[in-house]
């Protein structure tokens, strides 16, 4: 199979409004948002080649952050085109700050797994994202501890963000992050993430993450097992940044006799596809930031992000993704310029 290539230029305009309220307790409200457009040229699509690419609306984002005494509130809502799932809540939680080291969040909150917030630097994310193991938020409760050089996150998630479906209804594909869909549902998931920081001139981060939860099958009404673990390393030296992560996942649904258990359906952005039920994921991302601070340009970040999904299922071909590009920061405007190459990749191939 030949490699599929895509050139993407997303343009992001961000707006923030901070509204401090003058009162004795000093509640605080911050309203923000962004409007993003994409230019995309996909070499495997004849219509894209013939027209010289496509320039489209991507997303309108609304952010609300508020705090009062020790209570925090965070909301991130996205408005995508109907073909990409339409409106969806990316994150929405209420939190309590016991002190500077201990915090609690309840609601649709980010799953603590791997290098945060992302293993890469580009618009496309790395392959972890497409396996539901990066930039994902689920419904549950999360405890966060951060003191000196240590970070600890403990979380329990009752289920994925169901988007109004329940019972025997299949998971809606109108969602921001990839979750298990089809006749299987995520249930009763636990997460542990531990990170240690060290170094001064060279700043290092070593971390480990564990995920364990159920896979409820609506046909057999039995719960299988979902497990994943990751080891990550992040290094910063002056303008350089290096991120590396190894991830292993194993999905074991309990399906009716004769049904294929080697694949599991994932859904997001109004569409779904299948992934191997067992795999290792390797990611390496390197970036270099150049401060400019002249005219309209603040800085440039050059990067290369590579990820490989090694499928541990007989007869399956591995998937890979490599994105070379840069991001441009221009005040409230942020632009990615990415050259993406993929093989056996749902978003970089003939599926879409």
Locate the predicted segments by residue:
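Detector for outer-membrane/organellar transmembrane beta-barrel domains
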Residues: 196, 200-312, 320
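Predominantly the C-terminal beta-signal and adjacent terminal strand-loop region
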Residues: 330-352
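Bacterial N-terminal signal peptides
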Residues: 9-16
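Transmembrane beta-strands of outer-membrane beta-barrel proteins
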Residues: 29-35, 73-75, 104-106, 152-154, ...
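Sequence/structural signature of outer-membrane beta-barrel proteins
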Residues: 38-46, 78-83, 113-115, 120, ...
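Outer membrane beta-barrel
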Residues: 25-42, 51-163, 195-199, 283, ...
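Flexible, surface-exposed loop regions and adjacent strand-edge segments
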Residues: 48-52, 121-127, 169-175, 224-226, ...
């Amino acid at each position: 199979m030949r490699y599929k290539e895509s050139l993407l230029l997303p343009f992001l305009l961000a707006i923030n409004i901070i509204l401090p309220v003058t009162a004795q307790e000093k509640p605080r409200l911050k309203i923000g948002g962004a409007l993003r457009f994409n230019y995309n040229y996909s070499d495997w699509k004849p219509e894209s080649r013939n027209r010289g690419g496509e320039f489209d609306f991507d997303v309108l984002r609304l952010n609300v952050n508020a705090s009062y005494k020790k209570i925090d509130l965070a909301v991130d809502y996205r408005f995508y085109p109907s073909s990409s799932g339409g409106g969806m809540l990316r994150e929405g939680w209420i939190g309590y700050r016991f002190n500077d080291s201990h915090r609690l969040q309840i609601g649709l909150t980010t799953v603590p797994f791997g290098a945060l917030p992302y293993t890469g630097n580009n618009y496309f994310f790395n392959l972890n994202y497409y396996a539901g193991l990066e930039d994902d938020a689920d419904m549950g409760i999360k405890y966060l501890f951060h003191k000196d050089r240590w970070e600890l996150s403990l979380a329990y998630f009752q289920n994925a963000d169901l988007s109004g479906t329940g019972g025997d209804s299949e998971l809606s594909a109108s969602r921001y992050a990839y979750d298990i869909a089809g006749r299987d549902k995520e249930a009763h998931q636990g997460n542990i993430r531990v990170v240690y920081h060290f170094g001064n001139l060279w700043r290092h981060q070593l971390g480990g993450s564990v995920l364990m939860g159920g896979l409820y099958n609506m046909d057999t009404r039995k719960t299988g097992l979902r497990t994943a673990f990751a080891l990550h390393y992040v290094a910063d030296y002056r303008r350089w940044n290096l991120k590396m992560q190894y991830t292993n996942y194993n999905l074991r649904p309990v399906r009716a006799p004769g049904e294929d258990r080697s694949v599991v359906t994932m859904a997001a952005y109004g569409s779904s596809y299948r992934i191997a039920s067992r795999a290792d994921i390797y990611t390496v991302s390197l970036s270099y930031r150049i401060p400019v601070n002249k005219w309209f340009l603040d800085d440039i970040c050059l990067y290369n992000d590579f990820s490989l999904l090694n499928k541990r299922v007989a007869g399956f071909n591995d998937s890979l993704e490599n994105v070379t590009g840069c991001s441009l920061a221009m005040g409230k405007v942020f632009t990615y310029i990415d050259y993406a190459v993929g093989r056996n990749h749902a978003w970089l191939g003939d599926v879409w």
